Amino acid sequence: MADDGAEIKIRNILKKIKTFQMNSSKYEIIRLSKPTVLGGGGETKTDIYIKVKNKSNNKEEEIKISYKKPSFSFVENKIKSNRAKAIYGNNWSKIIQEQINEIRDNFLVKPLVYFEKSGRIEKGSITLGWRYEMEHSGSRSLGVKIKQDIAAQVWENKGAQAQYKDGIVDGNEIPLSGMPNFCLTIDPEKINTSEDIFGNLVSMKKLILTHGDITAAFLAQNYRSHKQKQEGNRRHLGVWLDWKILDGKLACEYVFDKPLEMESLPRLENLDRCLKQIGIDLKNNFKIDLLKDKIHESVPVYT
């Protein structure tokens, strides 16, 4: 979730130097890289990995940086069940269901079919469900303040699966390389020297104390019919819709009790099958206006 351009800029600055000052100590850079995940499938929390030697005592240390833009909000996205378990523990599903129940009524009033544009939601959008993500602060109607103390899991990657904690650095597995110990939050345009980097690092231990409030956020996963696509066919859904035909019209049931057990592509296929039952082809010459008078009265729409 970091900014790739800023990461590259930071590494390019550091490639040009051999030593730097931080906290009144002088360090020599031994290795500079970005940890990756063995086998792919996600990222570690560390964006910039630096192996250094403290010149005052010749001891080697690690500086593992998580970079964020000042405007950042989300601290976890594309959450799947394995990540939810790493964050919450074995009761992860029950915890998410409790969060959902707090705002259940808010889901029920959200439009599911958009016959007109609404804010950033385009005309022709049809909701398939809602992704489960996390913000360090938020006030959205489909957001719930998380009661559990999960700051260390979110910021430091505590409790993560081994491949996300022990990243691959230049071809070698380095224990805990995916658990950052510093955070850098600065506008990319203000990063021009090594002092801009090391002078603005905040230890993760300190950050956890000031950024411990985290919000569970449910974001709509919409099929954008005018572009014949959704953003990601394998997004895991916290809440999802089971589309069906009722009295010859498109209706749905909300599935609140199976968070992160369903991906977005099967929900699109479900919608496609239902529309074919009432003579509408979602993939060929589809226009959202074809659904007018075809939506069951129980389904909220935006017109």
Question: Could you describe each region identified by the protein language model?
Answer:
Residues M1, Y302-T303:
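Short, solvent-exposed mixed-charge patches
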